[in-house]
Amino acid sequence: MKKRVNTYLAIAITTYCNYQCFYCKKGGESISKERETISFDDVKKIIANAYANGIANFRITGGEPTSVSYFGELIEYIMKFKDTKVRINTNGFRILEYIDVLTKYKEYIDIVFSVDSLSKYICGVHFPKYLSQNVIEITRALRKNKISVRYNIVVTKLNECEVRELVQKAIDELDVNVKLLDLNRFSEYLGYSNEVTGKEAYDLWQRLFVPMSNFYDFLCQISTHSQIEWTTSLIGKKHGIPMSCYFRGDNWVQVKDSTRGARYSEFCRKNCLLYKKGECQEGVFSLFLSSNLVLHLSGCKNDSIHYDLNGRDNEQIERAFKSLLNLLN
């Protein structure tokens, strides 16, 4: 392993998801819209190359990663490498099937659980990722085994009325951390009943967007102290959107506020038309492997720095990692 770099590799191992959330897009976090899953052999090859290039932090996402048959084996594989950490983004679908392996490596793993509301329906809109009794039981089982859990809450005009109560339930009753996220501006969304694209997608974003400043007074009231810029251990400061954090007892609430702007590389500022047109919001903060084996920066739509790793040998994969890691410096 080369000198460790202070970032992570996110991997969308599948585009399959058991839920269809209105604010998500086809393919989930992957840039691919196809229904596909990375083979275990391919994902192992990429992880080994990432580790050899200094990446020891990994985020497993999708789609819904726990739906993939090799999910447990994947955790075991990553843990074979020294000093690795794994973050798992899930809606809890099959997470308890892997409780043994998660408990085995609990010091190096954290679960990011998507929970957006207290109610299943708000204003007639379905919220599949709500705080159901099943979600509560899964959370308690994970915490009983000392596994770190964080609830990710995507805030919109629809669920804003429930967010404050949800935050306090999460922290005080379930002993989990929380991250509040404002709504990403995509060119397409799954929508309430049908997919929306182009102007319809932009109009939906405008109608639903809630500024995080709506919550700052509340967070100050319930916290003992705060930091204006704070990160978890997977990335360092001065990358992407600066995120504040509010501490309450042993737990915390992190806030992703896109109105604070983001940090970009020199390449972005000088060469990227998408950056110059204001079409990139998240900045540069991590690497991402999409389900079609294309390696890119997280959230980056500039295909001139997308690297197709299908059928590539180790030397070619290493060059791709080096090129993207240079943009993070």
Q: How would you describe each model-predicted region?
A:
Residues Y8, A12, R59, R150, ...:
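Conserved beta-strand segments that form the floor/walls of ligand-binding pockets within enzyme
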Residues M1-T7, Y19-Y23, D217-G236, S290-H296, ...:
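Flexible, acidic/Gly-rich N-terminal and inter-domain linker regions that tether
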Residues K120-F267:
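Radical SAM enzyme [4Fe-4S]-AdoMet core and its adjacent flexible, acidic
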Residues F40-I60, V68-L181:
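Radical SAM/AdoMet-radical enzyme domain recognition
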